C-alpha cells in the first residue's frame, strides 16, 4: 500500500487555447476589448505560456495588436 506521506506530485492540467473550438472568438484588430485581455498593465503583449494561446494564434494575436496600435485603437505604452 502507498504510504500516507508519499503522494504523487500535483499535476497541473494544460489549459486549452481560447481561440480554438466551436464558438471561439475571431481575432480581429478592430476588437480592442478582446485584445486588451492579452496586453499587460504596462502595454506589452502577454506571452502564450501565460495565456495558453497556441503558437499560430499567438502570432495572429500579436499581428492584430500591432495593427491596432498603429491605427491608434490601442496604446503602445500604458502609464
UniProtKB/Swiss-Prot annotation:
One of its GO terms (cellular component) is cytosolic small ribosomal subunit. It comes from the Bacteria. The keyword Glycoprotein does not apply. Keywords: Ribonucleoprotein, Ribosomal protein, RNA-binding, rRNA-binding. One of its GO terms (molecular function) is structural constituent of ribosome. One of its GO terms (biological process) is translation. Belongs to the bacterial ribosomal protein bS18 family. Binds as a heterodimer with protein bS6 to the central domain of the 16S rRNA, where it helps stabilize the platform of the 30S subunit. HAMAP family: Ribosomal_bS18 (MF_00270). This is Small ribosomal subunit protein bS18. It comes from Nitrobacter hamburgensis (strain DSM 10229 / NCIMB 13809 / X14).
Amino acid at each position: 500500500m502507498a504510504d500516507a506521506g508519499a503522494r504523487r506530485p500535483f499535476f497541473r492540467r494544460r489549459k486549452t487555447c481560447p481561440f480554438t473550438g466551436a464558438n471561439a472568438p475571431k481575432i480581429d484588430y478592430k476588437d480592442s476589448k478582446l485584445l486588451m485581455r492579452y496586453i499587460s498593465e504596462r502595454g506589452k503583449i502577454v506571452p502564450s505560456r501565460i495565456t495558453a494561446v497556441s503558437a499560430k494564434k499567438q502570432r495572429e494575436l500579436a499581428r492584430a495588436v500591432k495593427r491596432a496600435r498603429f491605427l491608434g485603437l490601442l496604446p503602445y505604452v500604458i502609464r
